[in-house]
């Protein structure tokens, strides 16, 4: 990624952030410090301090596994990120929450829809329950008092990261949000409500978070739920355990007698959840180094459990995959004032955090979610709490139609109905939308029975954002072969998720075939970014080369057309998939386009 694409927006969308310029935008990337083992950590800190002394700004992105390495206990290897990376910047601009929102909005405007699809967990409910049972055994044996057990949700993210962040920020406004463009082309979208530690002029402040309840938006109901959460014996016990752990951790670098707990069991609403926090404060020893501070505090006890070391060993045993930046740390370090060893800094605990891989049209994503487990935890209840915490992401609606166009007549009924139902059902499942196969079939059959007895018709079956199905019909006018095709002026990105599904997000395609139609042609053919033929705006395409019909593979970026599949499976056609370049198209012996309404048609 070029330096301009590396940035960090640390975004305070809380009410306090609305009133004061507490968000920070870091630009003019000056370099990245990394380490892949504990041996390199002190060098990273030393280089970071040197950069800060030069007046640069530092944004650390630290993995949970860094803590295990610092404690010299087992940790699963990271394959797609360093153990720690510190982004260095020349510029830091302070912003209000509204200014931060405007900065994101200007980069999200005019982009294609952004969202997530194909959400899947690396731990199912049975495995989750089994892990909780094993944790209870460890607690009974005296190994631990509380374990923060977590798992991962994997998904596909599509659209602009700015547009996706904008949508999620509206659902989960928090004081420790972050949108970070990473040097490898990946991105972090964090919506964390939890402070790990903040240093301000010698004072350390930690605000561990334990205790969750649903928030519904009704002020009176939420007030009752907040009061119940604040008084809940189990949640108070969990919270207090972590407060004691944080008091002990802070005490290792604090001036004697300065560790205090000014606030216990505060409840705050963040989006669809209520969270209980407590505040721990201490005065930092003047001689404490950054290395000592991290050794004492990292990782945050709220996302391990107590006691920290043994509990982290249990976590490594029970969790199947590394956590990465989830439950590690994200934050900022300011340059020191004259005479100071280091300046102010602030680190959040990156919960509710999306890690996105590199990519343009489609990125692989991961979200960690977990719960604090004590002996009397109810496994099913804890699993439900995890699902609640993830709802800000998993409940993000994909607000576009998914549809099929089907050739039908009163006499013959709908053509290839099973194939159409299978395709729309697969698309609905991918985009997280309910789909009733039997209801869809009945709607189409009823629509056919209502058609005039003469003529051929186009049925359009659509699933709306609310998952409701609707079917409409229109007469299908005849066409005469061969049809004419033209070449589209623009190219497509083969990673664009909307090329693989029939949705209403097809403005470029509709404009292309309509422009072609205005010139007397049937369709416009597209090429992708690699110069490979893909499809038409409303048809798949086959070319005849050396006596063989060839159609581009789906990996080129195209719709898995119903008629395309029929032709590939039909022995009479002897058609195969293959890459088709511009030169091959120009030399082709024949061209054939097809769709579900028209079937195969020779083209020129």
Regions picked out by a protein language model, each given a short descriptive name:
Residues 1-406, 528:
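Extended alpha-helical targeting/anchoring segments
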Residues 239, 276, 381-458, 462-604:
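Helix-start/capping segments and mature chain N-termini
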């Amino acid at each position: 990624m070029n330096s301009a694409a590396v940035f960090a927006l640390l975004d305070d969308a809380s009410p306090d952030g609305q009133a004061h310029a507490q968000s920070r935008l870091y630009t003019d990337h000056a370099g990245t410090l990394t380490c892949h083992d504990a041996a390199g950590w002190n060098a990273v800190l030393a280089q970071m301090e040197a950069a800060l002394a030069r007046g640069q700004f530092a944004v650390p992105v630290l993995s949970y596994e860094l803590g295990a390495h610092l404690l010299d206990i087992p940790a699963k290897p990271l394959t797609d990120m360093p153990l720690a990376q510190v982004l260095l910047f020349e510029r830091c601009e302070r912003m209000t929450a509204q200014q931060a929102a405007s900065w994101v909005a200007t980069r999200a405007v005019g982009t294609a829809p952004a969202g997530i699809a194909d959400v899947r967990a690396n731990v199912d409910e049975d495995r989750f329950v089994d892990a909780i049972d094993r944790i209870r055994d460890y607690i009974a044996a005296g190994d631990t008092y509380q374990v923060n057990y977590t798992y991962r949700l994997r998904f596909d993210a599509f659209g602009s990261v700015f547009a996706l962040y904008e949508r999620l920020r509206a659902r989960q406004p928090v004081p420790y949000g972050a949108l970070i463009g990473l040097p490898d082309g990946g991105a972090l979208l964090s919506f964390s409500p939890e402070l790990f530690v903040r240093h301000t002029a010698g004072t350390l402040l930690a605000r561990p978070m334990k205790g969750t309840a649903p928030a519904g938006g009704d002020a009176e109901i939420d007030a009752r739920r907040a009061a119940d959460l604040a008084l809940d014996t189990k949640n108070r016990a969990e919270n207090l355990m972590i407060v004691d752990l944080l008091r002990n951790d802070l005490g290792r670098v604090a001036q004697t007698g300065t560790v205090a707990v000014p606030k216990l069991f505060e409840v705050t609403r963040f989006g669809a959840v209520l969270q209980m926090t407590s505040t721990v404060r201490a005065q930092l020893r003047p001689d404490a180094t950054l290395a000592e501070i991290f050794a004492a505090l990292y990782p945050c006890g709220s996302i391990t459990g107590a006691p920290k070391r043994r509990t982290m060993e249990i976590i490594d045993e029970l969790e199947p995959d590394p956590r990465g930046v989830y439950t590690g740390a994200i934050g900022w370090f300011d340059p020191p004032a004259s005479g100071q060893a280091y300046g102010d800094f602030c680190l959040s605990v990156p919960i509710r955090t999306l890690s996105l891989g590199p990519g343009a049209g489609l990125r692989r994503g991961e979200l960690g979610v977990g719960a604090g487990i004590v002996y009397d935890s109810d496994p099913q209840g804890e699993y439900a709490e995890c699902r609640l915490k993830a709802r800000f992401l998993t409940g993000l609606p994909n607000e576009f139609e998914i549809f099929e166009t089907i050739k039908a007549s009163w006499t013959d009924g709908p053509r290839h109905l099973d194939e159409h139902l299978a395709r729309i059902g697969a698309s609905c499942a991918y985009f997280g939308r309910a789909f009733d196969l039997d209801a869809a079939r009945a709607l189409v059959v009823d629509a056919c029975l209502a058609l005039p007895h003469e003529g051929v018709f186009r049925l359009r079956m659509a699933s709306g954002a609310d998952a409701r199905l609707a079917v409409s019909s229109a007469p299908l006018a005849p066409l005469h072969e061969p049809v004419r095709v033209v070449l589209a002026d623009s190219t497509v990105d083969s990673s664009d998720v909307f090329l693989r599904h029939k949705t209403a997000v097809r403005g470029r395609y509709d404009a292309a075939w309509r422009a072609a139609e205005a010139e007397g042609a049937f369709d416009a053919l597209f090429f992708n970014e690699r110069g490979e033929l893909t499809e038409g705006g409303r048809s798949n395409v086959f070319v005849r080369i050396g006596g063989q019909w060839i159609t581009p593979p789906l990996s080129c970026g195209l719709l898995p057309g119903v008629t395309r599949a029929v032709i590939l499976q039909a022995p009479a056609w002897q058609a195969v998939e293959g890459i088709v370049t511009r030169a091959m198209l120009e030399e082709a012996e024949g061209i054939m386009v097809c769709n579900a309404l028209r079937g195969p048609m020779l083209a020129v």
